[in-house]
Design a protein with these regions (language model features):
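Surface-exposed cleft-lining segments at the edges of enzyme active sites
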Residues: 98-107
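A short, well-structured juxtamembrane/interface segment
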Residues: 109-113
């Protein structure tokens, strides 16, 4: 049994599609609309959400490529500067906070997660979360809402560490914070690149959790079978009630 088991957040512990879309695509445009409602930017700026989205997507691609993360607030501020919009950082922070907190009621636990965590904890595993979240308080509050926060010794985010999940260093850091070598840890997540491949490059075992949403969808224009073929996990689970036995089998 591994000493430490790490978990991705979205699509592994919980579902919150609106939050993910905000974090990776729509945040600056949504912030502009919030600021427009308060009269802090003009109507033309508030209506420029498509330009803001395109700039933000470009920024997110650079984060993926470099492995260097910027927070939700920093990323939004960067996009607004590129658009020539001057807004105090404090106003951006407040708008991001409101938008993120408004999505907390939409968070739902993946079926069986609570029982899987309990079994792993009872088996002596130390548990942690590794999330690519750009706004760390959301993950903490979501875990509290679901009654899961007490299971985890560490909640590690890309924004909190400055490391995106394309950098294997975030997984080595997480293992170290929980008192384990990478070889003594496993990571469970749904993304074949940022969860599976990156964790394995860090020296951890990688368990690919494949939720129903992945199995029934086309992913980035590829068929599911083609998408799955690009992963090389140590184990695969499709239901959380399988997880503790799979972790035990990793040695």
């Amino acid at each position: 049994m591994k000493k430490v088991v790490l978990f991705d957040f979205h699509n592994t512990l919980a579902t919150c599609d609106g939050w993910l879309d905000l974090e990776i695509r729509t945040l600056p445009g949504a912030v502009l609309r919030k600021l427009g409602e308060q009269g802090l930017v003009g109507s033309s700026a508030a209506d420029a959400s498509e330009e803001a989205t395109q700039l933000f997507r470009r920024l997110r691609r650079s984060v993926h490529e470099s492995g260097r993360e910027v927070s939700a607030v920093e990323g939004t501020a960067t996009v607004l500067r590129q658009m020539g919009i001057d807004v105090p950082i404090e106003e951006i922070e407040r708008a991001v906070e409101r938008l993120e907190y408004d999505l907390l009621p939409t968070v739902e636990m993946i079926e069986g997660v609570d029982h899987a965590l309990e079994r792993l904890r009872d088996a002596g595993c130390r548990l942690g979360v590794v999330s690519s979240a750009g706004y760390p308080p959301f993950v903490e509050l979501a875990l509290e809402k679901l009654g899961l926060r007490s299971y985890f010794g560490e909640v590690i985010t890309s924004a909190g560490t400055g490391l995106y999940k394309s950098d294997p260093g975030i997984y080595r850091l997480a293992a170290r914070l929980l008192g384990a070598l990478p070889s003594e840890a496993a990571h469970v997540g749904d993304h074949p690149t940022f969860d599976v491949r990156s964790a394995r490059e860090a020296g951890l075992a990688a368990v690919w959790f494949i939720p129903q949403a992945w199995r029934t969808a086309q992913v980035r224009g590829e068929s599911w079978s083609d998408f799955r073929a690009g992963a090389n996990p140590d184990a695969v689970v499709e239901r959380m009630d399988e997880l503790s036995d799979v972790i035990a089998g990793l040695g």
